[in-house]
């Protein structure tokens, strides 16, 4: 076996320490209110990859990644009687140069993060069909490129039966077209994801939740260069087990735990990063989601979320950061009742980063946050309070 000449090392981390008005730092609805000053975990990803073969236009690249998550509460956090969890996130082979006429097209197989679309300030991937699979991506077709993948994303523990397997095999066909530019400074991407629950004969005999039907999610997005930044609008439609993603800030997981064969939903997202001045910029995410019949007792669910993060650079390395978020969600039930959720978050932070760009990392932040449940849900202080505060220090990095 020949020695591998070079190894690419990439990763991500976030970690810190904080307190709230009642004990350790609180985390509440961060995917709808914003993540700044609203994260209480320790999380990391370590990725190693290498081009193990290269000749002319032909390249074989191996990639791997493991992840770790814990609550950061102790010195030595292990998987034995502690809360640390380790995961295998990526392990795949990517081959270039074997498709005639398109040396940049990729044939791949294995386990991987697959073309995930991220809303960073709310820590959400709104288009995320990742897992074990295979496919061809970035094959040039007209003004853009097409990608086709088969990816597995099973549903586990569908119910509590003990007389058979409660894990259901689900396969996705993911088809995307990206790169078409309808006018100067714009770019687009379109895709269809088709999810197919693949039950066994024994599971078919159970009926009920195991009678789930194939579902579809359609995504279209257009982005535009704007004032030195960008703006993006996303439209999505989903049905069956994929419909709940439209109101849960999900990216494409299939719900097998509810009766969803009549479910439909749609979502509109607008996001952007705009430099207002040379030193001040704003990143925002607006989400409106609607879904019907996502459980056997739910009629309609509506969700609205708006988060904005502003950043002012004092120097190349020191910045003031503010983040404001709010959301409203209403679940209307078939019996005529409803359940409302709503809240706000306000955060101010001093950031120390390795450059003046909005997304410059690594970054250390000293933050203070106020969180409020405006629908009297009492999620804080052992379910006795509608609001609380956080104070702490967090670091975040990717490389």
Question: Where in this protein do the model-derived segments appear?
Answer:
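A broadly tuned preference for mixed-charge, low-complexity surface segments
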Residues: 50-59, 66, 118-121, 156-172, ...
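Detector for outer-membrane/organellar transmembrane beta-barrel domains
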Residues: 175, 180-333, 342-346, 352, ...
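Beta-barrel outer-membrane channel/assembly domains of diderm bacteria
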Residues: 1-102, 137-139, 273, 309-312, ...
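Surface-exposed coil loops of outer-membrane beta-barrel proteins
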Residues: 16-36, 76-84, 89, 101-208, ...
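Short proline/glycine-enriched turn/loop segments at secondary-structure junctions
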Residues: 278-280, 336-338, 356-357, 380-384
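Transmembrane beta-barrel outer-membrane domains
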Residues: 2-4, 37-43, 83-90, 125-129, ...
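Short loop/turn motifs that connect adjacent beta-strands in outer-membrane beta-barrel proteins
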Residues: 1-9, 49-62, 98-106, 140-147, ...
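Transmembrane beta-strands of outer-membrane beta-barrel pores
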Residues: 15-21, 66-70, 111-115, 150-156, ...
């Amino acid at each position: 076996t020949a020695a591998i000449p070079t190894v690419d090392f990439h990763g991500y981390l976030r970690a810190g320490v904080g307190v709230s008005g009642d004990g350790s730092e609180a985390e509440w609805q961060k995917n709808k209110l914003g993540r700044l000053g609203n994260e209480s975990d320790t999380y990391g990803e370590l990725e190693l990859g290498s081009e193990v073969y290269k000749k002319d236009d032909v390249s074989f690249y191996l990639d791997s990644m493991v992840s770790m998550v814990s609550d950061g509460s102790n010195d030595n956090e292990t998987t034995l009687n502690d809360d640390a969890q380790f995961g295998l996130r990526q392990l795949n082979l990517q081959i270039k140069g074997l498709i005639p006429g398109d040396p940049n097209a990729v044939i791949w197989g294995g386990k991987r993060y697959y073309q995930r679309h991220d809303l960073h300030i709310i820590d959400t991937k709104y288009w995320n069909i990742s897992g074990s699979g295979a496919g061809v991506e970035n094959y040039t077709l007209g003004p853009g490129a097409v990608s086709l993948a088969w990816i597995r994303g099973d549903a586990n523990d569908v119910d509590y039966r003990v007389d058979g397997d409660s894990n259901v095999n689900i396969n996705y066909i993911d088809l995307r077209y990206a790169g078409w530019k309808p006018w100067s400074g714009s770019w687009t991407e379109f895709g269809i994801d088709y999810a197919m629950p693949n039950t066994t004969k024994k599971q078919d005999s159970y009926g009920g939740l195991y009678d789930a039907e194939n579902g579809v999610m359609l995504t279209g997005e257009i982005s535009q260069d704007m004032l030195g930044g960008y703006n993006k609008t996303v439209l999505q439609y989903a049905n069956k087990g994929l419909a709940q993603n439209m109101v849960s800030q999900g990216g494409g997981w299939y719900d097998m735990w509810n009766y969803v064969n009549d479910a439909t939903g749609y979502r509109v997202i607008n996001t952007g990063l705009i430099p207002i001045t040379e030193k001040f910029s704003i990143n925002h995410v607006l989400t409106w989601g609607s879904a019907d019949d996502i459980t056997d007792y739910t009629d309609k669910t509506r969700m609205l979320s708006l988060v904005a993060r502003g950043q002012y650079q004092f120097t190349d390395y020191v910045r003031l950061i503010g983040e404001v978020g709010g959301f409203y969600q209403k679940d209307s039930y078939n019996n005529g009742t409803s359940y409302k959720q709503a809240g706000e978050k306000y955060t101010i932070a001093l950031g120390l980063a390795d450059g003046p760009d909005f997304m410059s990392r690594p970054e250390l932040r000293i933050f203070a946050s106020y969180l409020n449940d405006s629908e009297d849900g009492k999620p804080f202080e052992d379910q006795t309070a509608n609001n609380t505060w956080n104070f702490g220090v967090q670091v975040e990095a990717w490389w």
